[in-house]
Structures are given as C-alpha cells and as structure tokens.
UniProtKB/Swiss-Prot annotation:
CDD domains: Ribosomal_L30. Part of the 50S ribosomal subunit. Pfam families: Ribosomal_L30 (PF00327). The keyword Translocase does not apply. The lineage of its organism: Bacteria, Bacillati, Actinomycetota, Actinomycetes, Mycobacteriales. GO terms for molecular function: structural constituent of ribosome. GO terms for biological process: translation. PROSITE patterns: RIBOSOMAL_L30. Belongs to the universal ribosomal protein uL30 family. The keyword Protease does not apply. InterPro entries: Ribo_uL30_ferredoxin-like_sf (IPR036919), Ribosomal_uL30_bac-type (IPR005996), Ribosomal_uL30_CS (IPR018038), Ribosomal_uL30_ferredoxin-like (IPR016082). Keywords: Ribonucleoprotein, Ribosomal protein. This is Large ribosomal subunit protein uL30. HAMAP family: Ribosomal_uL30_B (MF_01371_B).
C-alpha cells in the first residue's frame, strides 16, 4: 500500500472536540506540520473527519 502525506493547513480553533482528537491521533499539532501515514481504512476515516483542515497527497 502507498503512504499518505497529511499536512494541516487550518487552525483547530473553533472546531469540535472529535476533530481535535482526530488531528492529534494523526500526529498533527500545528499549522503547516506534515506527517506520513500508512494508507489504510483507519487513517482514511480520521482524515475524512478533518478533510477541511488538511491536505492529503499520495507518496
């Protein structure tokens, strides 16, 4: 499977708690931080919750 490069592009101020938790689970702590995660159903679900706060690229 491919990897996904996830970059946070917007702030978590004013977001719901489940969205904040999803970003933390992905390992994102601030704007413009990038992490590489395995492309699997669990990570896709987390990304789907915060799709308006992040950009995703296949690596």
């Amino acid at each position: 499977m491919a990897d996904l490069k996830v970059t946070q592009i917007k702030s978590i101020i004013g977001t719901k708690q489940n969205q904040k938790d999803s970003l933390r689970t992905l390992g994102l702590k601030g704007i413009r931080q990038t992490v590489v995660r395995e492309d699997n159903a669990q990570n896709r679900g987390l990304i789907n919750v915060v799709r308006h706060l992040v950009t995703v690229e296949e690596v």
